[in-house]
């Protein structure tokens, strides 16, 4: 019987998920999980939850699905040791370092590969299975037939998202939020750049605004029969940041369909859809399940938040609690002050924002809504979006009052937060009537649950010592990466020590079909593989590898576990690409065990972290990117034809470029990442391989000359970004100091 897996972002959602029939729940604790903005579980709550859920014959999974920096590995070790003692049914992992640490020290912990690991083909799933990962959460971007193909080619357990919010970017590959301030999606700190309001300018010069990258919500309830017949092991509902009411209603609908579709497929699905009508989330989509028509899941006119649209605030007025007098504020001038007030996006309680002052002199603000089809009632939950997109706040309506308008007709005014203003949009999240009480899962007395992570020391891990011939294929010097053969010719006069060229539709045609001449020998070329590798790509790639190898191309840059599997036991040399994340020494060690000895830095990393991972001669294994226009969004579809713009800007005026190609769509920043002026310092501290990444960029000789001149003179380039190079990831969790004492040694390469 397939498993129904529901989210538990807090204890109330846990109660709802179990109460509505989920077979398993997944939850996070206060760190190392990809939803740090949800409430998550305290240590005693988690221990109680594991005990209680197991008594009910159900399962509980813990998210450990973020990348981990080197200075966090000891805290990770203590956390895994704690989980090993508590005994959840599995942990969800993204970082290869977590996999390596579990393999070494905690073999009892069952591992599931998070969707953030970007496993999207049978090759990737089978490689991870051999590494001890029992289940893989497949990438959301897969089509139905691709899921069926993977099922037919692996014995591993497969988990599929069937309902909830979507990321516009391919799983685990979004850099946008991190670029904007270090709040990385790979660290559970995503600020949802895809949900933001952007201004565009078309080729004709017309300016428009919209939510251009905010996808609708996934709903595959009518595809449950197909997925069940395919043999999917677990049906996953997204929503660790959603309310208990949402979790309960969605879980109930999918429970019903899973239990009854064999009796009456059509009628059961129809009933399930009716049950989902109250989830009050965004408009629904099958996303890419049936094909890649982006116009069906991107709607620039739809606000990035969830809920049923209730209209805009047409007028506001205030009323003192003790006096029944009301003062209308119908002019734009009256709202000028509150328009500039900051609105929290973290969902503050209504009582904290409802009025000013206290007691009999307290002031309550009321709003008149226009443009919707439903009048909220007292007790309903709403979300208010500021008209300038400066923030959003969730609020429970405290009261509804009737006031006469100019024509002496009674109109309903609802209480709103103090900084709500004319022009703000209002959405219904749930009605008071939806509120449902569930039986408590956790023990009423949590004092008996006292386990917490201890003070264990993480054994020291030494990377494999370098032999003289280990890096013979990876010489010191400057590497230049491009996207086309013509770009190879543009950069060739700069005489890089090696060239890297992306394998894409155009280069496949140039290298394999046309066998075009190159400005260099094939031994000077690395072929870089795209980080997203679904079944269709895997099939093509297997043929490409054979064809290119026969032509003399034997050096590769790999960016997905599938690439490792496809190149295994072939006479090739491999560099780990920037999307095979190596944020800690344990991840490097895991990749060493896959016979990868050279690496490319992730665009999100910092100098401090690289210095901590690689010491002494080990630094010669890491290629440092000095310049790039990093892909902030990587999307598995072409943008809608109506998107007739190349550039767009956010409300701060930062500019970004949108690019659609036969291989997908990309968003790049106007300001490139650059640390070109730091090369000489990096050489002094032992790093000696450097990358100039010009991929997905129109390469011009003049630009290359400027870059190389700055490189050799050690000059900083204007109008560029350091990304996270100096400050690293934003962190809301302070690190605890390590206990004194000497740590033991860990095993090296296995």
Language model feature labels by segment:
Residues 132-134:
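Long, basic N-terminal domains or extensions that often function
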Residues 122-123:
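Conserved nucleotide-cofactor-binding alpha/beta core module
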Residues 1-119, 137-141, 146-236, 241-332, ...:
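Active-site pocket-lining/capping segments in soluble small-molecule metabolic enzymes
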């Amino acid at each position: 019987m397939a498993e129904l897996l529901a989210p538990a972002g807090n204890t109330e959602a846990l109660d709802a998920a179990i109460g509505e029939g989920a077979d398993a729940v997944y939850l996070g604790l206060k760190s190392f999980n990809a939803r740090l903005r949800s409430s998550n579980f305290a240590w005693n709550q988690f221990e109680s939850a594991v005990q209680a859920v197991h008594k009910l014959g159900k399962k509980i999974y813990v998210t450990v699905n973020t990348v981990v920096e080197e200075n966090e590995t000891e805290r990770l070790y203590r956390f895994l040791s704690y989980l090993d003692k508590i005994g959840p049914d599995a942990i969800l992992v993204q970082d290869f370092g977590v996999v390596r640490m579990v393999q070494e020290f905690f073999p009892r912990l069952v591992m599931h590969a998070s969707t953030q690991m970007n496993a999207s083909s049978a090759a990737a799933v089978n490689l991870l299975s051999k590494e001890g990962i029992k289940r893989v959460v497949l990438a959301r971007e897969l089509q139905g037939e691709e899921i069926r193909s993977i099922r037919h080619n692996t014995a591993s357990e497969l988990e599929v998202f069937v309902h909830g919010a979507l990321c516009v970017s391919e799983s685990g590959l979004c850099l946008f939020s991190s670029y904007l301030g270090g709040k990385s999606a790979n660290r559970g700190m995503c600020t949802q750049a895809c949900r933001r309001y952007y201004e565009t300018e078309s080729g004709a010069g017309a300016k428009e605004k919209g939510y251009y990258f905010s996808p609708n919500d996934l709903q595959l309830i009518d595809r449950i029969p197909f997925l069940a017949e395919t043999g999917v092991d677990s049906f996953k509902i997204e929503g660790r940041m959603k309310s208990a009411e949402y979790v309960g209603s969605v879980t109930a609908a999918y429970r019903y369909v899973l239990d009854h579709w064999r009796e009456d497929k059509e009628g059961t699905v129809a009933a399930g859809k009716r049950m989902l009508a109250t989830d009050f989330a965004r408009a629904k989509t099958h996303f890419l399940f049936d094909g890649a028509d982006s116009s069906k899941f991107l709607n620039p006119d739809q606000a990035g938040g969830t809920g049923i649209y209730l209209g805009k605030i047409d007028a506001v007025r205030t009323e003192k609690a003790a006096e029944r007098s009301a003062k209308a504020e119908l002019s734009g001038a009256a709202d000028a002050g509150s328009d500039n007030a900051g609105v929290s996006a973290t969902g503050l309680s209504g009582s904290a924002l409802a009025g000013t002052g206290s007691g009999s002199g307290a002031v309550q603000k009321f709003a008149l809504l226009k443009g919707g089809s439903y009048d909220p009632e007292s007790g309903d939950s709403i979300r208010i979006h500021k008209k300038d997109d400066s923030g959003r706040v969730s609020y429970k309506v405290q009261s509804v009052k009737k006031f006469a308008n100019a024509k002496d007709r009674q109109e309903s005014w609802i209480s709103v937060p103090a900084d709500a203003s004319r022009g703000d949009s209002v959405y219904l999240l749930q009605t008071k009537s939806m509120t449902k009480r569930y039986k408590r899962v956790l023990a009423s007395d949590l004092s008996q649950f006292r386990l917490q992570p201890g003070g264990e020391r993480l054994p020291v891990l030494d990377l494999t010592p370098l032999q003289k011939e280990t890096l013979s294929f990876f010489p010191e010097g400057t590497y230049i990466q491009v996207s086309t053969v013509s770009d190879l010719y543009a950069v060739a006069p700069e005489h890089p020590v090696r060239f890297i060229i992306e394998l894409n539709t155009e280069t496949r045609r140039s290298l394999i079909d046309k066998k075009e001449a190159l400005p260099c020998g094939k031994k000077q070329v690395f072929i870089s593989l795209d980080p997203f590798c679904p079944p269709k790509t895997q099939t093509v790639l297997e043929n490409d590898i054979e064809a290119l190898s026969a032509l003399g191309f034997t050096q590769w840059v790999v960016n997905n576990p599938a690439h490792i599997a496809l190149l295994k036991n072939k006479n090739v040399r491999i560099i780990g690409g920037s999307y095979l994340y190596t944020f800690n020494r344990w991840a490097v060690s895991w990749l060493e065990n896959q016979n990868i000895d050279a690496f490319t830095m992730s665009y999100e990393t910092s100098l401090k972290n690289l210095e901590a991972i690689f010491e002494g001669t080990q630094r010669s294994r890491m290629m440092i990117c000095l310049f790039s226009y990093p892909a902030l969004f990587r999307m598995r579809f072409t943008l809608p034809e109506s998107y007739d713009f190349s550039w767009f800007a956010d409300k701060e005026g930062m500019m970004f470029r949108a690019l659609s190609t036969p291989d997908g769509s990309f968003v790049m920043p106007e300001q490139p990442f650059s640390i070109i002026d730091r090369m000489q310092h990096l050489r002094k501290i032992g790093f000696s391989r450097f990358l100039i990444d010009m991929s997905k960029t129109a390469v011009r000789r003049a630009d290359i000359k400027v870059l190389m001149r700055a490189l050799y003179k050690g000059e900083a380039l204007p109008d560029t970004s350091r990304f996270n190079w100096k400050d690293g990831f934003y962190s809301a969790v302070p690190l605890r100091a390590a206990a004194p004492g000497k740590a033991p040694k860990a095993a090296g390469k296995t």
